[in-house]
From Swiss-Prot:
Compartments it resides in: Cytoplasm
Pathway: Porphyrin-containing compound metabolism; protoporphyrin-IX biosynthesis; coproporphyrinogen-III from 5-aminolevulinate: step 4/4
Gene source species: Azoarcus sp. (strain BH72)
Protein name: Uroporphyrinogen decarboxylase
Purpose of the protein: Catalyzes the decarboxylation of four acetate groups of uroporphyrinogen-III to yield coproporphyrinogen-III.
GO cellular component: cytosol
InterPro entries membership: UROD/MetE-like_sf, Uroporphyrinogen_deCO2ase_HemE, Uroporphyrinogen_deCOase
Swiss-Prot/TrEMBL site (Transition state stabilizer) positions: 77
Amino acid sequence: MSRLKNDTFLRALLRQPTEYTPVWLMRQAGRYLPEYCETRKRAGSFLNLCKSPALACEVTLQPLARYDLDAAILFSDILTVPDAMGLGLYFAEGEGPRFERPLRDEWEIRNLSVPDPHAELQYVMDAVSEIRRALDGSVPLIGFSGSPWTLACYMVEGGSSDDYRRIKTMAYSRPDLLHHILGVTADAVVQYLNAQIEAGAQAVMVFDSWGGVLAEAAYREFSLRYLQRVVDGLIREREGQRVPSIVFTKGGGIWLESIAAIGSDAVGLDWTMDIGRARALVGQRVALQGNLDPSILFAPPEAVAAEARRVLDAYGPHPGHVFNLGHGISQFTPPENVSVLVDTVHDHSRKLRAAVGG
């Protein structure tokens, strides 16, 4: 594989000095880009897009052609793993992802098994390999998965939920069943991410999108414990290079110190926590990724730039910061505002370093 021309993102994750703050965006290949919408139309469906290595590669590269981003992220979906477990993923118009066979009885749960990433999920590995070849060493490629808890939410609820009634009922009435789901799912996530690393992913991220809906004791028992299990099982080095890991719990700022202790290289922050305070708490242990409110991208360009500078100023000219949004970019984002954001992050972070001689 080609040597990286821009490894700023990887160095930042390892808290090494960088010339500027690297930036990429969660969901950077998505519906806010007209070229993505055109490719999605050609694919016929979102799942077809995910399951075609050539089309997944095409949309992964689209934001990199527009913006000076410092990393690419595999185009896929967090629900590929439970789909490979046989739950039957489909997308209902106006409802988002659904499962034909959600986990509702003990027999189904006890028979849950880890899918082979080189069988049911080989299309993902083929996409990773194809994207790495297409990037030709320009920037690193991030692989990803949902967290065990977040995947379990979809697997038990059958789709998105407002109150998580089914899975929370299980957590408090039959925790043994939920722990079984989480254990199998954690092992599946480890195998899935390691297969992505072997296929060419140079960093990996675990999205714990729904960890923040839990009470503290429940978060530690049903989410954090299994995030730890995933991190412990990851491949740490590949092709002679460290493969950094990022863990992101949306709504997890109140547990930041505990999350930082599980062994990942970086912790993602949503927009509700001051990143300067976060650095003061855990900056000696982990890099931090974040944490602009995605809604700021609806504002005029000068407001976008001002808020980006505010986040950078809060973190300061220290190593270990990867700039990102606090959650995925909205489909309604004006594409030109992303240009403003990326350019501001690069320019202002260089000025911050120059001011201290860094």
